[in-house]
Amino acid sequence: MKKVPLVIGGKTLSSRFFIGTGRYPNPVVQNETIKASGAEVLTFAIRRINLEHPDEDAILQHLEGRTFQYLPNTSGANNAEEAIRIARLARAAGLSDWIKVEISVSEKTLLPDPVETLKATEALAKEGFTVLPYTSDDPILCKKLEEVGAAAVMPGASPIGTGLGILNPYNLGVIVEEASVPIIVDAGLGSASDVAKAMELGADGVLMNTAVAKAKDPVKMALAMKQAIEAGLLSYEAGRIPMKRYATASSQLDHLLSSHSKG
């Protein structure tokens, strides 16, 4: 199966790597890492941005001269009302009409609140936002988010920043199978093999921050993740062989033995 070009909110993206802008050791490393990733979509917490003067913001000013699709997120919001307010502020400041809805109530797990996420997604979609909600790996919830207007859905592989990888590949596979909008795997991916697995399961892309920013060499890790996306996508398009319980010889042993005995 060949993936069609990735289109979200009417925008065609050449890169399937979405990358976060936080937690890098310094702005130089941040810039070089983003460059190595080839990412077009950058996400950042709105609460960390100077909304009065976004062009002078310490996070965004180092990205001058390059064109990105900004994906502000509502990290820090505890309910739908807060997320909606934050999204409106970001749009009013001219950042973007793309918004990553991120609502959690537990500082320990940072797991997304399903009810509040659904409410915020529906409300913001009605206001004309291009909404990409961060959610759990629940196939039913992911489908409901799509139905209320999500432009793409972003299920977590595991809790944010844990690096635990894909805890429930079955659910992720079902989410992809049932979706009519792009699925971007978000949170918990820790290595290039995690990324390749997500793409092999049929994901349309991945969003990463901690696994890259906190790596010993963020620039190299960004390149590794970029190549893993490409490898995983190629593997998905090529179609893996079915898994079986018992072995199958790659050579026709019966035919070879029969020919040898006749000789």
UniProtKB/Swiss-Prot annotation:
Pathway as given in its UniProt record: Cofactor biosynthesis; thiamine diphosphate biosynthesis
Active-site residues per Swiss-Prot or TrEMBL entry: K100
Catalytic activity: [ThiS sulfur-carrier protein]-C-terminal-Gly-aminoethanethioate + 2-iminoacetate + 1-deoxy-D-xylulose 5-phosphate = [ThiS sulfur-carrier protein]-C-terminal Gly-Gly + 2-[(2R,5Z)-2-carboxy-4-methylthiazol-5(2H)-ylidene]ethyl phosphate + 2 H2O + H(+)
Sample GO molecular function, one term: thiazole synthase activity
Entry's EC annotation: 2.8.1.10
GO cellular component, as recorded: cytoplasm
GO annotation terms (biological process): thiamine diphosphate biosynthetic process
InterPro entries: Aldolase_TIM, Thiazole_synthase_ThiG, ThiG
Compartmental location: Cytoplasm
Keywords annotated in UniProt: Cytoplasm, Schiff base, Thiamine biosynthesis, Transferase
Residues the record lists as binding 1-deoxy-D-xylulose 5-phosphate: G161, A187, G188, N209, T210
Pfam short name (any one): ThiG
Main location: cytoplasm
Organism superkingdom: Bacteria
Known role: Catalyzes the rearrangement of 1-deoxy-D-xylulose 5-phosphate (DXP) to produce the thiazole phosphate moiety of thiamine. Sulfur is provided by the thiocarboxylate moiety of the carrier protein ThiS. In vitro, sulfur can be provided by H(2)S.
Family statement drawn from the similarity comment of this UniProt entry: Belongs to the ThiG family.
Subunit-level organization: Homotetramer. Forms heterodimers with either ThiH or ThiS.
Cross-referenced HAMAP family: ThiG (MF_00443)
Protein's recorded name: Thiazole synthase
